[in-house]
Amino acid sequence: MVYSSSVDISASSKALNFNSYHYLIRQSIYILIGFIFGYIAFLIPLYFWQKIAPILFISGLILLVLVLVPGVGKEVNGSRRWISLIIINFQPSELVKLFTVMYASDYVLRKSKQMRTIVKGFLPMLGIIVLTGFLLLLEPDFGAFTVITVIAMGLLFLGGLTYKIFFSLLFFAPISIYYLITLQPYRLDRIIGFLDPWDDPLGKSYQLTHSLMAFGRGEFFGSGLGASVEKLQYLPEAHTDFILAVIGEEFGLLGVSIIIILFAFLVVRMFGIAKESIQNKKPFSALMAQGIGLWFGIQGIINMGVNLGLFPTKGLTLPLLSYGGTGILINMIAIAIVLKIDFENRRNMRGQFY
């Protein structure tokens, strides 16, 4: 789908030497590297991730700071989210998502006896998330901030945070979101465009209306692989944030339904693996699997919702499907860690302790 959704934009780009296979080749290389790093991650014992989780998270914060440094961070489409490594633009926020899962899992276990208190259990983690969010909003990357917040707060709740504190947080969340939206005019424009996309189809709602037209043209069975019209440079970011719209146009409701079912199965299976870890008395492994499940689940829901016009545009990719070097690499490492957790669960069930 990366090739199908990017073939026109790459074939017509002088900067890409009019190579229609540009994005396909790069994504294939990223996937190959992802398999290598994923295999390495699979070989690493889970207790090692827990041991170095705080160091990894601090390293992630340092990378978020470096993104903001002129000459280090690279600005694309008005956002400074990348660090240029000559052959690849590295996006630290993707790495921070994984590090947040590790750190929050370790934090919950270290603070297990204090998780039901506000001062010692909740506030320290809240302060860390606020700091992370501040750095992300300076880029700005509201989508990554949303995902990381859900991961951290979700793991705190699963780790024993009281219902009173959790639902109090849910009460104040809309107020914070409203403030963040009104803080930047472009976010307010996105909300206005989302509420009535056909009021300004050539302006604020251009991306959304073309996404909806793609789904409409696909109908039930789609127009066929490679037959999308919207990917012909009508729909911006067709190979990244809006790849689901291209899938909807080429494979119809049937294709989109299959994608949704596969994502649901993946997330449910991750939580199933977490349940097995709990039964094997491996709380860190359980929290890691739950955290990665939350990450893939919330990012998938937001991306699909944006494509379908259910949420305002966020700038989030669809895990495992959208084009993006850092994204696919980190996604594959995360999947490898979940496979490692499942592998250890099966060994324990057979009586082979690792």
Predicted regions and their residues:
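Membrane-helix boundary/helix-loop-helix interface segments in multi-pass membrane proteins
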Residues: 1-3, 7-139, 304-319, 323, ...
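Hydrophobic alpha-helical transmembrane segments of polytopic
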Residues: 26, 53-63, 151, 258, ...
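Alpha-helical transmembrane segments of polytopic integral membrane proteins
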Residues: 34, 38, 101, 105, ...
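Hydrophobic alpha-helical segments of polytopic membrane proteins
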Residues: 54-61, 122-135, 142-182
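Hydrophobic, glycine- and aromatic-enriched re-entrant/interface helices and adjoining loop segments
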Residues: 74-82, 165-258, 283-288
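Hydrophobic alpha-helical segments of membrane proteins
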Residues: 138, 146, 222, 257-261, ...
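Interfacial segments of multi-pass membrane proteins
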Residues: 146, 151-165, 229-255, 315-329
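Hydrophobic transmembrane alpha-helices and their immediate junctions
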Residues: 254-298
